[in-house]
């Protein structure tokens, strides 16, 4: 039934969804809801919270834009562009980090927590998968890392095109994924979705390690599965004598 405040309608136009598979254009086939008011103004519904209006400054044109900005961080266009750039870089680091944490532990080569213990020793020697690293002392590694990151950051700062900052192409696209514009948009959306999951995964690794120091995520998972009732986050934050021996 129509009310005096407005009519609610659903359009079949596709918008991105976290759960739905992406099409070649990077959009899903799920419908979005719009609100048609008596004044004729139509407002798209935010995909992250159906029924809530999409913020005016988020038009859905950016990969992974689902209308979620409760703190209004993206209201200033310059800030929004900087946040998009920062997010995609952190996504890529996280996607490198998560398999880097899981794979060595799965192969029985130690966990990511113990891998860095050498740095705390006076004459510590860095190793990679059990093998000594050339020039593997802490000052040398820090110097190499500083110079490498400084060079990369300088090149990024000199680039004025915001799209090329995020997607430089060229040598960074050896398989030519960006040649097909429609496919490229789909891959952008997949990258941001997987990157966000990877960032959450790494936060989970850090929380898990803080709760059970010295253990890796796979070891901790195996311990939890062996005795879920006693080996869980509640075992850390709630005294055990409250819920039994």
Curated annotation (Swiss-Prot):
PTM comment: Photoregulated by reversible phosphorylation of its threonine residues.
Gene3D superfamilies documented for this protein: Chlorophyll a/b binding protein domain
Keywords, ordered alphabetically: Chlorophyll, Chloroplast, Chromophore, Magnesium, Membrane, Metal-binding, Phosphoprotein, Photosynthesis, Photosystem I, Photosystem II, Plastid, Thylakoid, Transit peptide, Transmembrane, Transmembrane helix
GO MF entries: chlorophyll binding; metal ion binding
Binding site for chlorophyll a 2: 90
Membrane topology qualifier: Multi-pass membrane protein
Keyword Repressor: no
Compartments, as annotated in UniProt: Plastid, Chloroplast thylakoid membrane
Binding locations of chlorophyll a 6: 224
Membrane-spanning parts: 93-113, 132-152
Induction: By light.
GO cellular component entries: chloroplast thylakoid membrane; photosystem I; photosystem II
Residues at which chlorophyll b 4 binds: 156
GO biological process: photosynthesis, light harvesting
Cofactor note: Binds at least 14 chlorophylls (8 Chl-a and 6 Chl-b) and carotenoids such as lutein and neoxanthin.
Task of the protein: The light-harvesting complex (LHC) functions as a light receptor, it captures and delivers excitation energy to photosystems with which it is closely associated.
Family to which the UniProt record says this protein belongs: Belongs to the light-harvesting chlorophyll a/b-binding (LHC) protein family.
Protein name, entry field: Chlorophyll a-b binding protein 1B-21, chloroplastic
Organism: Hordeum vulgare
